[in-house]
Every structure is written in C-alpha cells, then in structure tokens.
C-alpha cells in the first residue's frame, strides 16, 4: 500500500449536488434557497446569537461571578488521606507524587476529618487545631 494509491471505499463518497443548473435538475433557479431575503443572498446570514434586533439572550442575562485564580492554588487534605501515604516525612512534593493534590497547588491545609494511626512528619503544610492535636497524639510532628 502506498499513500498515492489510497482511495475511499466504493460507494463511500457522493458527488456534490449541482445547483442552479435548470428546472429539470430539481434545484434550478433559486438553488434550494427559497425566494428573496437575506438568507437567499450570497454572503448573507446573521451572526451567531443575533435575534432579529431583539436584545440577545447573552446580553439579557446578568453577569455573574468570576473565576478565582487562587482557588486552584489552595487544597485541603483529610487526616485519613495522610494515612494512605507510605512515606513518613510528607511535604507538598510527596502529596503531588501520590496524586492527592493537583500539580497547580502551592498551599495545602490538613483538616481534622477521618482518623490517623501512624506518626507522620509534615513539612511546609498548614494544619487546623484539631488536625494538629490528632497528629501529635499519635507521635507525629509539624514543621513549617
């Protein structure tokens, strides 16, 4: 097989319909466009969202909210998720490699949700009061 010999399967393609070539073709004179009007002219059609002069929907509805740029930079982590990591010394890089936080995250905070039974050392990770108590109760430590 060569690139210059490749062809579509028999019957897979159809010739384009020739319009404006006489009454007998079924698509003569107006060529399937109907009579007069903007849509019958060449190059004549309204822009997307145009509603004939009526105020378009995208302008009738109010603007609402915004996308926070800091939302993707911050993440929360549960105590029970720390339990699943095999390493004892945990920092943001370890969490990214474990797939617990997104690669765009730069700030992580551990919240007191779930339980932890092994001692872990957190580096550069913020914790809530309840999470700090739970981690230190099992012999873990938190470094900033």
UniProtKB/Swiss-Prot annotation:
Keyword annotations for this protein? Answer: Ribonucleoprotein, Ribosomal protein, RNA-binding, rRNA-binding
Which PROSITE patterns has this protein been placed in?
Answer: RIBOSOMAL_L15
Q: Where is the composition biased (Gly residues)?
A: 21-31
A GO MF term: structural constituent of ribosome
Please name one Pfam family that this protein belongs to: Ribosomal_L27A
Question: Region (Disordered) spans which residues?
Answer: 20-49
Biological process terms from the Gene Ontology for this record are:
translation
Q: Which InterPro entries match?
A: Ribosomal_uL15, Ribosomal_uL15/eL18, Ribosomal_uL15/eL18_sf, Ribosomal_uL15_bac-type, Ribosomal_uL15_CS
GO CC annotation: cytosolic large ribosomal subunit
The family line of this record is: Belongs to the universal ribosomal protein uL15 family.
Function according to Swiss-Prot or TrEMBL: Binds to the 23S rRNA.
The subunit structure is:
Part of the 50S ribosomal subunit.
Report what the protein is called: Large ribosomal subunit protein uL15
């Amino acid at each position: 097989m060569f690139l210059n010999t490749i062809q579509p399967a028999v019957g897979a393609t159809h010739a384009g319909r020739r319009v404006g070539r006489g009454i007998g073709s079924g698509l003569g004179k107006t060529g399937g466009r109907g009579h007069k009007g903007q849509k019958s002219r060449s190059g004549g059609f309204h822009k997307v969202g145009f509603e004939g002069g009526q105020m378009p929907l995208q302008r009738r509805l109010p603007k609402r909210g915004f996308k926070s740029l800091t939302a993707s930079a911050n993440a929360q982590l549960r105590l029970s998720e720390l339990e699943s990591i095999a390493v004892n010394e945990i920092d943001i890089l370890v969490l990214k490699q474990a797939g617990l936080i997104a690669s765009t995250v730069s700030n992580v905070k551990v919240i007191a949700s779930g339980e932890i039974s092994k001692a872990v050392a957190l580096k550069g990770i913020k914790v809530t009061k309840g999470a700090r108590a739970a981690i230190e109760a099992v012999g873990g430590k938190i470094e900033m």
